[in-house]
Amino acid sequence: GLWSTIKQKGKEAAIAAAKAAGQAALNAASEAL
C-alpha cells in the first residue's frame, strides 16, 4: 500500500544520505591528510 511505499522511500533516502555523509567524511579526511 501507500504507507509501505512511503516507508520504502524513506529507507532508501536514509541510506543515500548515510552514503553521502560517509563519502563527505572520507573526502574531508583525505583533504586533512
From Swiss-Prot:
<keyword id="KW-0964">Secreted</keyword>
<keyword id="KW-0027">Amidation</keyword>
<protein>
    <recommendedName>
        <fullName>Dermaseptin-H9</fullName>
    </recommendedName>
</protein>
<keyword id="KW-0044">Antibiotic</keyword>
<dbReference type="GO" id="GO:0005576">
    <property type="term" value="C:extracellular region"/>
</dbReference>
<comment type="function">
    <text>Has antimicrobial activity.</text>
</comment>
<comment type="similarity">
    <text>Belongs to the frog skin active peptide (FSAP) family. Dermaseptin subfamily.</text>
</comment>
<dbReference type="Pfam" id="PF12121">
    <property type="entry name" value="DD_K"/>
</dbReference>
<feature type="modified residue" description="Leucine amide">
    <location>
        <position position="33"/>
    </location>
</feature>
<dbReference type="InterPro" id="IPR022731">
    <property type="entry name" value="Dermaseptin_dom"/>
</dbReference>
<keyword id="KW-0929">Antimicrobial</keyword>
<keyword id="KW-0878">Amphibian defense peptide</keyword>
<dbReference type="GO" id="GO:0042742">
    <property type="term" value="P:defense response to bacterium"/>
</dbReference>
